[in-house]
């Protein structure tokens, strides 16, 4: 990698523990840059960065940037932050995360993965197939790739795979040689102002692909399909279950631990190619769609069919994407506890559908709504997102820094679920109350799936042990 000299001075990341910031910091550190950062609290990511030799300070204070040559901020950091204000006062350049990522991307050919949902898993799948094909990409992802134990890795090849976050529009800085759009849903309207402007941004993202590149779009998603006529001068490759897709999945068979399917690829010359007997060790039709886009990228590199099969077979998944975090023994059987990041109604539906595919008995959903504003804006969608769950437990809303909104809380969601016909929904106020409620009702081969982007992951981590303890005390 050549480009910005490593002698530019110390680069300070404000909020370095964030999943997007930490990946860039890790790659730049491994390239030889002087990297440090600050965050408001300790955590897994902070510990990992320190183990790499990166200095991380806890708390945001003006003195943290006194030796910095550049300050990098995420979209979560705003004016008024003492480190940002100190940098501006001392004329230290302040750059957004996407701008720094764009600098790294400018030095390599890039696969940029965008979409409202599925970006992290898709980015991981693309990286897995390139690895299997003998290409060693640099990867910057929005989640921990289990096979790496990190969300980032510095590779030796001239290619980079990045997750392109659309939340604040900054993904338009990320010009991919190859681009993927998984879906387009009405999210981040506080930034864009309208859903039409969200769609405009994705059209621009695809239009930024160079003439020698390509964009892969999921034709199954109606909004993605609707933007196809607006992009006339770029090479577009569609994928999905649709008979019109250029890359299509057929012969789909849900099996233990995932899905088996055949990919059918229609070339521009009309020739048909089949990659049969692909095993994807992840449940859910949405993950097959994600896999099809990764196959499309792999074919651009002429990666052989056998390597594609091998890459998927060895795919270890992503942390907090249908991750098994606990098991409760009941007689000769057990109950699995699954942790998943899904927090938008579309994601929740997809995850519960995947759980339903793999469940032998009941699917028990535990959801922690993320942000009062999201629950308020999408209340109707949330109320109909849990049809594949036999039972729903709703934890208190994870505020993520927001102020409460009157009438928008866990009880409101429970009431709405019941009004929309759900037979079993109730609120719980703590991990302990959840464990007590579940201890008496679970049966062998049930699946408990914890959903949300907040600290519900901590609830999930301790749930199996808590339930087991309660059942032992009460001889259940």
Swiss-Prot record:
InterPro entries cross-referenced by the UniProt entry: Mur-like_cat_sf, Mur_ligase_C, Mur_ligase_C_dom_sf, Mur_ligase_cen, Mur_ligase_N, MurCDEF_pg_biosynth, UDP-N-AcMur_Ala_ligase_MurC
Pathway annotation: Cell wall biogenesis; peptidoglycan biosynthesis
GO molecular function: ATP binding; UDP-N-acetylmuramate-L-alanine ligase activity
Domain of life: Bacteria
Pfam families xref list: Mur_ligase, Mur_ligase_C, Mur_ligase_M
Subcellular location: Cytoplasm
List of residues binding ATP: 115-121
E.C. no: 6.3.2.8
Signal peptide interval: none
Keywords: ATP-binding, Cell cycle, Cell division, Cell shape, Cell wall biogenesis/degradation, Cytoplasm, Ligase, Nucleotide-binding, Peptidoglycan synthesis
Top-tier EC class: ligase
GO CC entries: cytoplasm
GO BP terms: cell division; cell wall organization; peptidoglycan biosynthetic process; regulation of cell shape
Catalytic activity: UDP-N-acetyl-alpha-D-muramate + L-alanine + ATP = UDP-N-acetyl-alpha-D-muramoyl-L-alanine + ADP + phosphate + H(+)
Protein role: Cell wall formation.
HAMAP family: MurC (MF_00046)
Similarity field: Belongs to the MurCDEF family.
The name this protein goes by in its record: UDP-N-acetylmuramate--L-alanine ligase
Primary gene name: murC
